[in-house]
Amino acid sequence: MSANSPTGNDPHVFGIPVNATPSNMGSPGSPVNVPPPMNPAVANVNHPVMRTNSNSNANEGTRTLTREQIQQLQQRQRLLLQQRLLEQQRKQQALQNYEAQFYQMLMTLNKRPKRLYNFVEDADSILKKYEQYLHSFEFHIYENNYKICAPANSRLQQQQKQPELTSDGLILTKNNETLKEFLEYVARGRIPDAIMEVLRDCNIQFYEGNLILQVYDHTNTVDVTPKENKPNLNSSSSPSNNNSTQDNSKIQQPSEPNSGVANTGANTANKKASFKRPRVYRTLLKPNDLTTYYDMMSYADNARFSDSIYQQFESEILTLTKRNLSLSVPLNPYEHRDMLEETAFSEPHWDSEKKSFIHEHRAESTREGTKGVVGHIEERDEFPQHSSNYEQLMLIMNERTTTITNSTFAVSLTKNAMEIASSSSNGVRGASSSTSNSASNTRNNSLANGNQVALAAAAAAAAVGSTMGNDNNQFSRLKFIEQWRINKEKRKQQALSANINPTPFNARISMTAPLTPQQQLLQRQQQALEQQQNGGAMKNANKRSGNNATSNNNNNNNNLDKPKVKRPRKNAKKSESGTPAPKKKRMTKKKQSASSTPSSTTMS
């Protein structure tokens, strides 16, 4: 770089431009890769900067077009994807609908055969139907005890080889009340309703709602031979019990000793190889309505079912328990009399002598305690209801009682009105006995007044009955009871606050309206006076007790300061004769009070 060249005017202050020609090395402003100089006009046209500007403008235009096209293509692709998804969904829905229609057509053309169910209802049929199934539970009978347990798993019961009593299961004695009740249910063929929850918790197997109980009688056993014995030995034996046919094992019985030593030897061999087996019975325990109800309650103990579940449950129970429900109406005996006997009918017949129909009834019973001997016995509702306040309160919610009370109230109104009218007529007669004309006039007036009073009383009673017998009376009675209860609580609180004893049990219950404001004011004034009197008495008592306490304290303090002086001994007074005087008796409290009362009365 030349030292004379100004720094501010030199655009290339950091050195010589790169790749410059040697002729242009000294020129400070020549750009990189500069071609040789040309005509300015041509240079303007073919200038590289102008070319680059024009190319950049063209490229920018093409770029903007491609961006718009890309956005449009993306939108088209999105629309195409959405359309393809919709078409796929439509095809799937059509396939599903087609499959459903196809299956429906198959069901209509080729109906499924109904499952044949073997309905049995009596106990023998149910036992025969489930004879190859395991029983629900077992009942073992021993000499001194009984046992209830779950069924054994093996076909050959363990109790057959070991008939002694084991500890598994519920062991009961002969005198147990639970055992007696259970045996009663077994004899009746009913499931005990008290063990429904236990059966559900123990997972006992039910068969069409029934329980199959297998009974083992260990007191009456039979000799059973195993299957390894020869057939000739088994052929000579005969079964001893026809009821014990639960297992296919042979029952060996000793034959009569008529054939000699060979038979006895065979019998002894059979006895050695056989073992004792208890007699086995099967019985059925059926449910009833109470056990079904307890079963439903046990299932609904911790869950609350909806109405639909309850209805479905009830329908299934009715289907299983009341399958042969007959809804046919019985024949009318009077329309189908020709199908019945003549003695089964007793029709009324016309008696020409009495000129009336005579109805033939059966003779009344003459047993003691029957209606034919005792007659009609009036019940509680047939007794006349007395319109007392207590009974009206106790029976205030009974509609029948209100009508009877209203009737008695109406009768009492009319009776009082007639008494008032009769008393007024008697007074008028006594005053006007001087002249007959005036007496006749007063009698007519009294009768007219009596009729008017009676009519007014009847109208008032009818009005009372109409107002007290409507539907609004029910609400008014409830309102009255609530108000009476509130007033009772208020009186109780007032009595407790004022230290007044509550009303005794035999006090008269007022059925009138609540107290008026004037009565409440008088009651408050009386309570205030009683409180003042009680307060003054308490204050006087407190003052007296305070004064006594202060005087006692002062005396005690003085006594503490001074030493205690010994009192001189009292010598017994002697009489003039020299003998000691008799001791005076102390007066009792009763005599003191009796002697003090007249003086107090005289002083007052």
UniProtKB/Swiss-Prot annotation:
Annotated keywords: Nucleus, Phosphoprotein, Transcription, Transcription regulation
Localization: Nucleus
Molecular functions per Gene Ontology: transcription coregulator activity
Annotated Pfam families: Spt20_SEP
Stretches with biased composition (Low complexity): 231-249, 258-272, 519-533, 547-559, 593-604
Modified residues (Phosphothreonine): 516
Bias (Basic residues): 582-592
Chief site of localization: nucleus
tRNA-binding keyword on record: no
Gene Ontology cellular component annotations, sorted alphabetically: nucleus; SAGA complex; SLIK (SAGA-like) complex
PTM-bearing positions, type Phosphoserine: 446
Subunit structure: Component of the 1.8 MDa SAGA (Spt-Ada-Gcn5 acetyltransferase) complex, which is composed of 19 subunits TRA1, SPT7, TAF5, NGG1/ADA3, SGF73, SPT20/ADA5, SPT8, TAF12, TAF6, HFI1/ADA1, UBP8, GCN5, ADA2, SPT3, SGF29, TAF10, TAF9, SGF11 and SUS1.
Record function comment: Component of the transcription coactivator SAGA complex. SAGA acts as a general cofactor required for essentially all RNA polymerase II transcription. At the promoters, SAGA is required for transcription pre-initiation complex (PIC) recruitment. It influences RNA polymerase II transcriptional activity through different activities such as TBP interaction (via core/TAF module) and promoter selectivity, interaction with transcription activators (via Tra1/SPT module), and chromatin modification through histone acetylation (via HAT module) and deubiquitination (via DUB module).
Miscellaneous note of the record: Present with 4150 molecules/cell in log phase SD medium.
Protein name: SAGA complex subunit SPT20
Taxonomic lineage of the native organism: Eukaryota, Fungi, Dikarya, Ascomycota, Saccharomycotina
